[in-house]
């Protein structure tokens, strides 16, 4: 009996071999596509479905690619020939919400924004807010260790997960972590799985750490600067002053101009970079006033509003970055992080690389935590070698400045060739050994993160 026959025999009509499903599973939002269609898509509805799929895959040594909404930007969920796609989007229930304990138990397929809309009814929220929050799943957020605009103040996914239910490659179900605020029993396998991009197991449930909804007004600040370096230095000055905005976003001149063009807004002055900042909590007005003072002292033209609608409009300009880039051509959206004080130097490096390669690299940044998203624009579907060469220089520049290859998008298959440069050979090999402990047969998402684990 073939693998496909075994899947159909045990799982029935949740096994999908339609051309549409198979084509969709070849790509994510990175622009990269696998070389061919996978074997089948299993639309799991229960933990038992996941376990059955993994047992069949293990018995037949068939590779499995776990997939949520396919909104990733590093190719981690792209499936190719001979692989089973295990889709978790149908596992989208909220199993439990405990406002008294500030926790929720959810299945992996629920969308980030859908979860928070439901949680808001009980006065709580889950803090990670990636730009894809309207369309990305909690399972995908966990797989990549996602962040977002609010993470400088409220943390990333790793700060907001208490426990995970994990199906291993052989189909066994593990319950990792705890429901309590504290817990140091044994090794922290929950944190190990977060950000592992489907290499260690299949997340089928998550116990999430919630927060109370933040009460009171929210202030929004915009500040314009004559150069992106000045804007980056001003954002570092805000942090150095001991101020903690909820959101601090930076748009360089090219990204700001592209978004204004997309939204039919008046064109900014040439070379203008912009900071968009949001404060919240009991001290929001005082914090905003102090931040405005720092920005003006740093040479910025700053304005503040406490009008909620205007604040959302201003943040909407930043959130329109991805469609603005898509309007310019095919986009390789990159993701590096550096210490916040090194952001001006990182923008200097980007300018150097632009000049050396004769290209434009529109860049936005989560300035509150030093996470930059340079965008490489090109024609066609495949990334040209020259663009990869420029990206490689950019990655190495981030490493030289004490940073990292990825702050929130993950390694996937697009950055695996540079991973050993950051980790060093010993740590790279140790991490590959850890993958083999969880998945001795190497059937979970092979070729991703570690090209040959």
Predicted regions and their residues:
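Noncatalytic alpha-helical scaffold of FAD-dependent oxidoreductases
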Residues: 1-453
């Amino acid at each position: 009996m073939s693998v496909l026959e075994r899947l159909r025999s045990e799982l029935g009509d949740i096994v999908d071999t339609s051309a549409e499903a198979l084509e969709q599973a070849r790509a994510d939002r990175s622009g990269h596509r696998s070389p061919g269609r996978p074997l089948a898509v299993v639309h799991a509805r229960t933990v038992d479905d996941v376990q059955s799929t993994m047992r069949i895959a293990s018995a037949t040594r068939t590779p499995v690619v776990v997939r949520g909404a396919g909104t990733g930007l590093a190719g981690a969920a792209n499936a190719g020939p001979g692989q089973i796609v295990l889709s978790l989007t149908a596992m989208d229930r909220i199993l439990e919400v405990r406002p008294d304990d500030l926790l929720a138990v959810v299945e992996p397929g629920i969308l980030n924004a859908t979860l928070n809309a439901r949680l808001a009814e009980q006065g709580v929220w889950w803090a990670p807010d990636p730009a894809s929050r309207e369309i990305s799943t909690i399972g995908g957020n966990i797989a990549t260790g996602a962040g977002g605009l609010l993470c400088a103040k409220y943390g990333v996914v790793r700060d907001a997960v208490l426990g995970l239910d994990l199906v291993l490659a052989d189909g066994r179900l593990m319950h990792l972590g705890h429901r309590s605020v504290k817990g140091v029993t044994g090794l922290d396998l929950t944190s190990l799985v977060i950000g592992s991009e489907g290499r260690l197991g299949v997340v089928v449930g998550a116990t999430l750490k919630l927060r109370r909804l933040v009460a009171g007004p929210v202030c929004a600040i915009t500040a314009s600067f004559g150069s992106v370096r000045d804007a980056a230095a001003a954002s570092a000055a805000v942090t150095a002053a001991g101020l903690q905005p909820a959101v601090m976003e930076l748009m360089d001149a090219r990204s700001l101009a592209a978004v204004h063009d997309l939204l039919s807004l008046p064109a900014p002055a040439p070379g203008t970079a912009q900071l968009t900042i949001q404060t919240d909590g009991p001290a929001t007005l005082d914090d905003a006033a102090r931040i405005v003072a720092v920005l003006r002292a740093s040479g910025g033209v700053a304005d503040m509003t406490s009008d909620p609608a205007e604040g959302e409009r201003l943040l909407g300009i930043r959130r329109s970055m991805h469609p603005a880039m898509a309007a310019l051509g095919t986009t390789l959206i990159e993701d590096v992080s550096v210490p916040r004080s090194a952001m001006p130097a990182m923008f200097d490096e980007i300018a150097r690389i632009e000049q050396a390669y004769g290209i434009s690299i529109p860049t936005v940044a989560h300035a509150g935590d030093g996470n930059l998203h340079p965008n490489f624009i090109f024609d066609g579907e495949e990334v040209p070698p020259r663009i990869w060469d420029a990206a490689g220089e950019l990655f190495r520049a981030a490493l030289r400045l004490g940073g990292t290859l990825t702050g929130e998008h993950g390694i996937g298959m697009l950055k695996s060739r540079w991973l050993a440069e950051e980790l060093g050979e010993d740590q790279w090999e140790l991490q590959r050994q850890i993958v083999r402990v969880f998945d001795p047969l190497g059937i979970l998402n092979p070729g991703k993160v570690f090209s040959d684990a």
